[in-house]
Amino acid sequence: MNKDVKERRKAPLQTPTDLGDNARRDISGALNALLADVFALYLKTKNFHWHVSGPHFRDYHLMFDEQADQIFAITDDIAERVRKIGGTTVHSIDNIARLQRIPDNDAEFVDPLDMLAELRSDNQALITSLREAHDLCDEERDVATASLIEVWIDEAERRVWFLYEAARRGDPTGH
């Protein structure tokens, strides 16, 4: 094997892109923070799915599972977008824990209405972070990442809506 081939194989993972080095670094950083938040939100949503209890068990259990599936589904898209623009992704649980902004909930019991409120708040925080990342992508003219983020914002807004409506208290007749 010649020397050039050996050197290329040792080179850092840097997918060719027309984005500048600063744009690639900043967008990859923003996406990795989002990826950490998405993993944290996924695990919290799944935890609440496993531990929900009470008269609305079935409805909340199913909703949390659907939302967790939707959240997990974007992890690969986020990570692959980082790679497409020449960055590297989070590598470990420890790396995720250092980057995540969505707090964990290690409580043994959480009231179902508190679960709804906490997940709603976490999804709203995710939306804020997504909008900030979108602004960065707009500044750097990364329309592909911005386009993906728009879909993720819409999905998170839908989750917030469902969590909000599930927590509303109707009158005694159910209306």
Q: How would you name each of these model-derived features?
A:
Residues R81, D94-V151:
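Acidic/histidine-rich alpha-helical segments that form the ligand environment
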Residues V52, H56-N95:
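Conserved alpha-helical segments that form or flank metal/cofactor-binding pockets of metalloenzymes
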Residues V52, F57, D69, I93-A97, ...:
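Long, contiguous binding/interaction regions
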Residues P12-L34, P112:
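Disorder-to-helix initiation segments
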Residues M1-T17:
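Acidic, low-complexity proline/glycine-rich segments
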Residues N32, A36-F39, D65, D69-D76, ...:
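Generic structural signal for well-ordered, non-transmembrane alpha-helical segments
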Residues D18-D26, L41-E66, E132-A144:
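Helix-loop segments that flank and shape redox-cofactor active sites
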Residues A73, S147-T173:
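Short, contiguous alpha-helical
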